[in-house]
């Protein structure tokens, strides 16, 4: 083996977070702190409450109008346009699909925040009038790579409904 191998974070468990109003659920790594985000209705879950640049933001809202699978192309264009508005944004990967009434958009991208390059994974879920926005971000690209297994579990378990 060449060089030291960096360990990855280890799971001690997962906690279920359910939004009864909009009907979505997500699994958050056990031990992550829920923090209030000023000027936002999002919940922010951080592995270290002293590092507000690393963690997962979860926000659901009622759009007031039904989103249909036929809206996918329009949503995708607006989503990518929004990502590209960030300074130095580079989209690394993107996906968009409609399955039944569910629409899912996601992208991984880097952007410049002052002198620092940050990395995010954004996923939007739409069903009916509900939108769920998930943003996994780390203070640096290297920290994102470290926390990615935890981000993956949270982002991929988000769904409309409950865990049974």
Regions found by a protein language model. Give the residues of each.
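Conserved polar/disulfide-associated segments of primarily extracytoplasmic proteins
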Residues: 1-11, 34-133
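Short aromatic-glycine motifs in intrinsically disordered, low-complexity regions
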Residues: 14-27, 147
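Proline-anchored loop/turn motifs at beta-strand termini and strand-loop-strand connectors
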Residues: 21-39
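Generic detection of long, well-ordered alpha-helical segments
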Residues: 22, 69-73, 144-148
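Short beta-strand segments and strand-loop junctions that repeat across beta-rich extracellular domains
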Residues: 23-28, 57-59, 159
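Surface-exposed amphipathic alpha-helical segments
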Residues: 32, 132-164
